Amino acid sequence: MESLLECFAITDGKCHPDCLKANNEQEDYDACQSAALVAVSLISSARVIFKIDSKYTEYSPQYLVDNVGKEEVEGEMDQPSCQYTVGNLLSYLVENVWTKKEVRQREMDQQRREFTVKDCFEFAFKKGLPRNGHWAHVGCIFPVPPFACQIPRVPMKGEVIEAANVSEALKLGMQQPAAARLHLFSPEFDLVGEGIYDGPSGNETRYVGLRDVLMVEAEKIKGETVFTVQICYKKKTSFVKVSTRSMILPLNGDDESQVTEPACLLVDFCIPRFSIN
């Protein structure tokens, strides 16, 4: 296994041309990739804040994409096919890397699962996480090798703490950065720039959906609580100020029959609370 980890270090994030092409064709990260990226960022931050890690350590988001929600196989690590041997490595290359891209992509699409940042936290506390350089990059199109279960993981102990509203989220944010999901409307979000994103503004508004964000700061602007969030949208990371006032959100177009009850643009607040021994 040490030789495999050494290979990861030598390749230093380089990937197969098919991976590069697939990633370039993907306009934005999908929901699972986004959730995993936010989760590992918050885990890394929290572990430094509470002095569990002596320095900021990046953990693998793709490990979460590959494994959260996956059915567990009892005794997997003891199976012959899950041992890191030259024979198993060659079998993997023949069956996966040297097959046609279309076959691989079809298999990946069939195995795709949906999960949230909270699911990622819970999985990390249960199974631990490998360091970022010890697993595939985000968006890797190749199946996980059976022997990848032998890759060492950093154990994590803790629980997920959730906040039901903005007031509770403010308290969470005083201790460490928190995760949330943001209702995205276009073109308002695309045009916000240095201003405050305050949701839909007219009949031309289009609801994009929920996006995972990191809440990094709260402040009062003209008497209103405003959160600064970090978001990766269309694969570009930016910091945006978001209004916390409640409003009517047309989540399915501008048909009044689809308008929901007053809600906040930010929802689903949570943090990973680590146990400190």
UniProtKB/Swiss-Prot annotation:
Subcellular localization(s) per the UniProt record: Cytoplasm; Nucleus
GO-annotated cellular components: cytoplasm; nucleus
Native source organism of the sequence: Arabidopsis thaliana
Subunit description: Interacts with the heat shock proteins HSP70-14 and At2g33735/HSP40, and with NFYC2 in both cytoplasm and nucleus.
The entry's keywords: Cytoplasm, Nucleus
Keyword DNA-binding applies: no
Biological process (GO), any one: response to heat
Induction: Target of TAS1 (trans-acting siRNA precursor 1)-derived small interfering RNAs in response to temperature variations, thus reducing both basal and acquired thermotolerance. Repressed by trans-acting small interfering RNA (ta-siRNAs) siR480(+)/siRNA255-mediated transcript cleavage. Highly up-regulated in seedlings exposed to heat shock, with higher levels of isoform 1 than isoform 2. Induced by HSFA1s-mediated (e.g. HSFA1A, HSFA1B, and HSFA1D) promoter activation.
Keyword Nucleus attributed: yes
Superkingdom to which the source organism belongs: Eukaryota
Major localization class: cytoplasm
Tissue: Expressed ubiquitously, including in seedlings, leaves, stems, inflorescences and siliques.
Stated role: Mediates both basal and acquired thermotolerance via HSFA1s-directed pathways (e.g. HSFA1A, HSFA1B, and HSFA1D). Triggers the expression of HSFA1A and HSFA1B.
Protein name: Protein HEAT-INDUCED TAS1 TARGET 1
UniProt family annotation: Belongs to the heat induced plant HTT protein family.
